Amino acid sequence: MEYSIDGMRRDDWAQVAAIYLAGIQTGRAAFRSEAPSWEVWDRAYAGTCRLVARSGSEVLGWAALTPVSNLCVLAGVAEVSIYLAPSHRGQGIGTALLNRLVLLSEERGYWTLQSEIMRENETCIRLHETCGFRRVGVRERLGRTCDDKWHDVILMELRSRTVST
């Protein structure tokens, strides 16, 4: 399948939200019950690091960064979110998206990317490891999903090799 990776646009939101919701519904991707509105999502995510993989007009997946803090000393640290449409998983799209997000983050001056991934989401953990992230810890029983099940979260990190720290 041919696809391109480019900046997310406002008119991508309906498809992005549907992909996000599909991930939420797995019970292994997020501690929330529904995708937020565009306005809420737009305020939370870094405007300069939002990508989609698309084939024609179809969004196949998305990746974006959330700043971890508004403190200037942490301005180069962000959390990764990456979600793929169920029908497009296992095709290398996630690897391409995450690698492109890493490059874009370095262009924008981020020196550390981190991800918090539910222990059960082994595919996402492997994706991050493939893209150079390392496990740095575990937060046990961090939160519960809508089914009232507690989940451990694996902390993963990637330090930039190009952004001076």
State what each model feature region is.
Residues 2-16:
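A short beta-loop-alpha structural element at the N-terminal edge
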Residues 10, 17-35:
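Helix-loop element at the rim of GNAT/NAT acetyltransferase active sites that forms part
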Residues 29-87, 98-99, 104, 159-161:
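Acetyl-CoA-dependent GNAT
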Residues 58-61, 123, 150:
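Glycine-rich acetyl-CoA-binding "A-motif" of GNAT/NAT acetyltransferases
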Residues 64-67, 114-118, 129, 134-151:
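Conserved catalytic-core motifs of GNAT/GCN5-like acyltransferases
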Residues 89, 115-125:
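Conserved beta-strand-loop-alpha-helix junction that forms the acyl-donor binding cleft
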Residues 90-103, 126-130:
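Conserved acetyl-CoA-binding loop-helix of GNAT-fold acetyltransferases
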Residues 105-117:
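Conserved GNAT acetyl-CoA-binding A-motif
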